[in-house]
Amino acid sequence: MSDRDYGWCGMALSSHGRAADWFTGFTASSFDLLHAGHILMLKEASEQCDYLIVGLHIDPSVERPEKNKPIQSLEERMIQLEGCKYVDEIHTYTTEAELESLLNTLPIEIRIIGEEYKGKAFTGSRNWWHETYYNSRDHEYSTTELRQRINNEPV
């Protein structure tokens, strides 16, 4: 007996509940103050795979104090991501070690990460079995810029 199940559509499903021949992608961020830049990134990421898993960083400032603590609660960010049509599955993590564990245990074929990481070491970059796709950033949307606008600071 195989570990596959057949879903309502008659396609073979893996133990994770998706088609066994689907190409699975993974991207991660804190997704604080979800904005147009995040949506464009998730759209581009979803175009690289059949099933997109998102790693939701609970609080980047825990390990890196120079990073901004999220303004929105984890619950708010989860609700927003759950409502995004480009996201198929969400896993939370706090530390880079937890992210590494996700990368090592989830059935990921492609890691999707920002183009600013090209040529740099990043969590999971040593995992040779992952293909890496670098998201483009051809827009000006950012959480930092949004925070400045909210605080009436010059952009």
Task: Identify the residue ranges that each predicted region occupies.
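Nucleotidyltransferase catalytic core that binds NTPs
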Residues: M1-V155
